[in-house]
């Protein structure tokens, strides 16, 4: 589905008329059930549940969030390519601009309040940003495996990604190969591959075959321009300067962190929680224990469902 934002002024001062915003709704129609907004991550999209759903293990009848009892809404981040449109420039928006657009999208749909906003990775940062801009919008927010501000380590990785995109002869494939190393951990890869050789007889290592597979797979389903946009947006995460400023958010805040995350590190999530909880009692901290690093939010579904489910009760 698509709506049009009549007028939008980006933080760089550019004014857009009739800006298209695409989205999907699952479950009961808007206005008839508690509404959950799901913000997608870097290579994600609005298909969060159902036949093409990339988060079905969490958002389904078998998962923690039931689309039978909750209306599920997800927008596409402009430029992610899922609507078939290519972005002319990677740097035209910041993540704050995306949050502003999503809020205008909610206004267009007549949405005054949300039961919850949930998102992981960049989608989690977007969750922080939306709640910061409209502190009373949601009853609950669940930012997963993310940060309210880009760390120097994250900025290091996004610069490497941009350099690969600019200089590689096979930019999308090579950028994805590097990104996979950020999304996993040494312990995860060592345990899985044990320095074994690939099964294809090429003589290469199994881990090399696996990395190339992920690079090739993304090339088939993702636009190079979209990857550039999403990488740029990741580097613009900056809700506020200090965590204490997040106390303006009235929602119950459930921070979910992964103890082995190399991209959005566990210690920073803990520091954010500690800065908040002394001023805001309805702040809670949950840990996913895993050797798999950042991608654990897409792998450790038993733990994630156990963490999230209590806040999404379904009537008997």
Region locations from a protein language model:
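Alpha/beta-hydrolase-fold enzymes
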Residues: 137-217
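N-terminal cap/lid subdomain of alpha/beta-hydrolase-fold enzymes
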Residues: 24-82
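Conserved hydrolase catalytic core segment
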Residues: 113-152
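Conserved alpha/beta-hydrolase "acid-adjacent" motif
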Residues: 262-271
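Catalytic-loop region of hydrolases
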Residues: 1-35
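Catalytic active-site module of serine/aspartate enzymes centered on a nucleophile-bearing elbow/loop
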Residues: 270-316
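Short beta-strand/loop motif that positions the catalytic acidic residue
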Residues: 249, 255-257
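Conserved acidic catalytic loop of the alpha/beta-hydrolase fold
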Residues: 96-115
């Amino acid at each position: 589905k698509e709506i049009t934002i009549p007028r939008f002024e980006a933080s760089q001062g550019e004014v857009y008329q009739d800006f298209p915003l695409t989205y999907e709704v699952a479950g009961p129609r808007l206005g008839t059930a508690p509404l959950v907004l799901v913000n997608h991550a870097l290579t994600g999209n609005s298909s969060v549940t159902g036949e093409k759903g990339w988060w079905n293990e969490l958002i389904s009848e078998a998962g923690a969030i039931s689309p039978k009892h909750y209306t599920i809404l997800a927008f596409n981040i402009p430029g992610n390519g899922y609507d078939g449109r290519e972005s002319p420039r990677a740097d035209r928006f910041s993540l704050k601009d995306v949050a502003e657009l999503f809020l205008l999208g909610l206004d267009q749909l007549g949405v005054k309040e949300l039961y919850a906003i949930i998102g992981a990775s960049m989608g989690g940062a977007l969750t922080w940003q939306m709640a910061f801009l409209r502190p009373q919008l949601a009853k609950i927010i669940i930012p997963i495996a993310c940060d309210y501000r880009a760390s120097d380590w994250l900025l290091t990785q996004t610069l490497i990604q941009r350099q690969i995109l600019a200089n590689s002869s096979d930019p999308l494939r090579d950028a994805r190969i590097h990104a996979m190393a950020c999304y996993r951990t040494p312990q995860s890869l060592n345990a899985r591959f044990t320095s074994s050789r690939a099964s294809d007889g090429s003589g290469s290592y199994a881990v090399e075959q696996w990395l190339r597979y992920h690079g090739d797979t993304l090339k088939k389903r993702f636009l190079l321009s979209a990857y550039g946009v999403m990488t740029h947006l990741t580097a613009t995460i900056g809700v506020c300067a200090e965590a204490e400023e997040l106390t303006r958010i009235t929602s119950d805040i459930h921070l979910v962190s992964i103890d082995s995350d190399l991209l959005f590190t566990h210690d920073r999530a803990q520091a954010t929680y500690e800065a908040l909880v002394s001023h805001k009692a309805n702040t809670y901290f949950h840990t996913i224990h895993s050797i798999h690093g950042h991608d654990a939010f897409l792998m450790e579904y038993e733990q994630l469902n156990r963490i999230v489910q209590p806040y999404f009760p379904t009537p008997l």
